[in-house]
Curated annotation (Swiss-Prot):
Residues 107-354 are annotated as: I. One of its GO terms (biological process) is cellular response to heat. One of its GO terms (molecular function) is zinc ion binding. Along with ClpP could be necessary for degrading proteins generated by certain types of stress. It comes from Lactococcus lactis subsp. cremoris (strain MG1363). Residues 359-394 form the UVR domain. Residues 407-598 are annotated as: II. It comes from the Bacteria. This is ATP-dependent Clp protease ATP-binding subunit ClpE. ATP binds at residues 152-159, 481-488. Residues 80-99 have a biased composition (Low complexity).
Length: 748
């Protein structure tokens, strides 16, 4: 098969494309393909087809391929990139298509006129940015290097400064040199789009700059200006937008306003030649009071859009609550989001129909009614007549100020609760009862540790009514005491009371963080290490669920760097992860458990001087494991006392309830006599080991016996455990009752 271009060499390259739904195949030799790749269609025709005379052929096979590559139909209207050799092009060889439109200017095609939007009143009022706007005007008024770049965190109002500049130009409140200027926002993505062939992007940029020079009234605004570095460069020697703009920016031929974040501005700073042509203008995050002023300025716009009313308390709550509880965002953006979302939510309850929509539906029904009348389909005509009358009734309904929904502080609080899962509203009746009874509910499950329960309950109550310290966690406690006395159990029950499940907490076993290199897992690996892109195990979970309970089990086993990390968390309620994000712990409850020092102190049971001496001894032993600055940052160091036999009797009841819950799936119920319970306590009592031996005793004497009895007698569902001959025996409850009755009759 010969090359379709030169008809001399063997075709070794086959190109496939789809044009207007039809598959096309082009067969080329290596030489013709290289010519086409480097020089485009004109070079290919000049080199290969000159001898064949095929360059003017109206249906040349290459036309479709180049039309497809350039995003146009060969027979349709050609863009300004169409080579003059193609039929239908702008050259003398191709007749003009009568349907072809006159091409728009590059600025109209790839830009949005912000000044025109300001004239039409389509932009929101810009409030509290007078200093930044004044600084931008001063830079634009310079002779050279008059290109301000607004830098600041996302959502602080950088684009609003440019809109404020456009509004001042419309109002005439600018120097004479800036009068009648047009601020046009350039879309860099659209500018790059469709420039896959080498040289197309440079040509488009050159035409854009020529147009700006001719007009001499354009201030070009590029949002995310760091995109111009590398834009249009395909890696094969093409120049990017930044390099093309450099000469014009230096001489003042082109006035450019940019906006980007602090992190992304570093991309521009890497190109020193480009960076020196720009003048940075820092846009800081507004304060809460300034945010309230901004919200009041745009309040009317959101009220008109959502057909609602905002109270002054709602405006203030949006600023204060967003600043307090929404951590990853910046003012005023996150406060405006609360206004917008609360308005959207309230608007859903409003029975309001757009008048323009009603008019359109009435006109449509009128035309259909007339068509039905002409077709003598009177039943259908009557249907449309009734529909028109209903629409006219709707048209008369108007939403008055009395009917308009009002957004209050409670509505804003509900939005914050939905976003963060943090309860910030007024105490509901159920929650109020829960907080009142919190200590009693915890004491019912955590036996013998009343002091620890009371301190935890008071800390949560303080935080819930707004008396907590603003920059510290809800509470931070170190639980110390011998093993098996309920330190971890108290944390589980607290999570169950607050979040509904004992597993709803962020729990870390500190034995996993004994090595120095493993500490980085909490906040993420540092740059240059494996796992840098992965989030920290602690910081990411707290960032997603700020209202949470964090349990660090056996803290004395952790590497000292973990405690150094928590110094800042316990004091300031914040920590920066490996990605540079600041994570707030202000709404978290931090509990650490430890049995450090208890091994050196003899366990004792009871009250009085002996216990007081033991307490002092344990706290003295803690200094051997923890530094003073670490222990000094806790809200409380709570010692858990050893359990007495009376405590164990109550714990036995709780453990037996768990056994009944497990066997209840098989419709079995177990009753245990008081004598059997006391026997279980005698077998499992060990002050040094706490309640854990009791669980093993119940497993050996109760659970194993139940399993044996049920396998032999599956028909019995009501079981009883009793002490017979100093042994715990499982039997059928009916049988046990009968035997007891027989023994009592002779005694009478």
């Amino acid at each position: 098969m010969l090359c379709q271009n030169c008809n001399i060499n063997e075709a070794t390259i086959h190109l496939y494309t789809s044009v207007n739904g039809q598959k096309k195949q082009i067969d080329l030799c290596q030489n013709c393909y290289q010519i086409m790749k480097s020089g485009g269609q004109e070079a290919l025709f000049g080199a290969g087809n000159a001898s064949n005379g095929n360059s003017d052929e109206p249906f040349n096979p290459f036309n479709d391929i180049f039309s497809a590559l350039q995003g146009q139909d060969f027979n349709g209207a050609a863009s300004n990139q169409t080579p003059p050799t193609q039929t239908g092009g702008r050259g003398p060889r191709g007749p003009q298509n009568p349907r072809a439109k006159q091409p728009k200017g590059m600025l109209e095609e790839f830009g949005i006129n912000i000044t025109e939007s300001a004239r039409r009143g389509e932009i929101d009022p810009v409030i509290g940015r007078d200093e930044e706007i004044k600084r931008v005007i001063e830079i634009l008024n310079r002779r050279t290097k008059n290109n301000p770049v607004l830098i600041g965190e996302p959502g602080v109002g950088k684009t609003a400064v440019v809109e404020g500049l456009a509004q001042k130009i419309v109002d005439g409140d600018v120097p004479q040199k800036l009068q009648n200027k047009e601020v046009i926002r350039l879309d860099v993505v659209s500018l790059v789009q469709g420039t896959g062939i080498r040289g197309q992007f440079e040509e488009r940029m050159q035409k854009l700059m020529d147009e700006i020079r001719k007009r001499n009234d354009v201030i070009m605004f590029i949002d995310e200006i760091h995109e111009i570095v590398g834009a249009g460069s395909a890696g094969d020697g093409n120049m990017d937008a930044g390099n093309i703009l450099k000469p014009a920016l230096a001489r003042g031929e082109l006035q450019l306003v940019g906006a980007t974040t602090l992190n992304e501005y570093r991309i521009i700073e890497k190109d020193a030649a480009l960076e020196r042509r720009m003048q940075p203008v820092k846009v800081d995050e507004p304060s809460v009071d300034e945010t309230i002023t901004i919200l009041r300025g745009i309040q009317a716009r959101y009220e008109d859009y959502h057909h609602v009313k905002y109270t002054d308390e709602a405006i203030e709550a949006a600023a204060h609550l967003s600043n307090r509880y929404i951590q990853d965002r910046f003012l005023p953006d996150k406060a405006i989001d609360l206004l917008d979302e609360s308005g959207s939510k309230k608007n859903l309850t409003l029975k309001f129909v757009d008048p323009e929509d009603i008019n359109r539906r009435i006109a449509d029904a009128e035309s259909k009614k007339n068509e039905a009348t002409k077709a003598e389909d009177f039943e259908k005509a009557a249907h449309f007549r009734d529909q028109i009358s209903k629409l006219r009734e709707l048209q008369k309904q108007e939403v008055t100020d009395e009917d308009m929904p009002v957004i209050t502080e409670k509505d804003i609080e509900q939005i914050v609760e939905q976003k963060t899962q943090i309860p910030v509203g007024d105490l509901k009746e159920k929650e109020q009862t829960q907080l009142i009874n919190l200590a009693d509910d915890l004491k019912a499950h955590v036996i013998g540790q009343d002091e620890a329960v009371d301190k935890i309950s008071k800390a949560i109550r303080r935080s819930r009514v707004g008396l907590g310290k603003p920059n510290r966690p809800i509470g931070s406690f170190l639980f110390v005491g011998p093993t098996g006395v309920g330190k971890t159990e108290l944390a589980k029950q607290l999570a169950k009371e607050l979040f509904g499940s004992s597993e709803s907490m962020i729990r870390f076993d500190m034995s996993e963080y004994m090595e120095k290199h493993s500490v980085a897992k909490l906040i993420g690996a540092p740059p240059g290490y494996v796992g840098y892109e992965e989030a920290g195990q602690l910081t990411e979970r707290v960032r997603r669920n700020p209202y949470s309970l964090i349990l660090l089990d056996e803290i004395e086993k952790a590497h000292p760097d973990v405690m150094h990390m928590f110094l800042q968390i316990l004091e300031d309620g914040r920590l920066t992860d490996a990605q540079g994000r600041t994570v707030s712990f202000k709404d978290s409850l931090i509990i650490m458990t430890s049995n450090a020092g208890t091994g050196k102190v003899e366990a004792s049971v009871g009250f009085g001087a002996a216990r007081e001496g033991r307490t002092k001894s344990v706290l003295g032993q803690l200094g051997d494991f923890f530094s003073p600055e670490f222990m000094n940052r806790f809200d409380g160091i709570i010692e858990f006392s050893a359990l007495s036999k009376e405590n164990l009797l109550k714990i036995v009841d709780l453990m037996l309830d768990e056994v009944n819950e497990q066997i209840g799936r098989n419709d079995i119920h177990l009753s245990v006599t008081q004598a059997a319970k006391e026997k279980l306590v005698d077998l499992g009592y060990n002050p040094a080991m706490g309640a854990r031996p009791l669980r093993r005793i119940i497993q050996e004497n109760i659970e194993d016996s139940i399993a044996d009895f049920y396998i032999e007698h599956p028909e019995y569902k009501q079981l009883v455990a009793d002490l017979i001959d100093d042994k715990i025996v499982i039997s059928n409850q009916t049988q046990e009752t009968a035997e007891t009755t027989d023994e009592e009759v002779p005694a009478e």
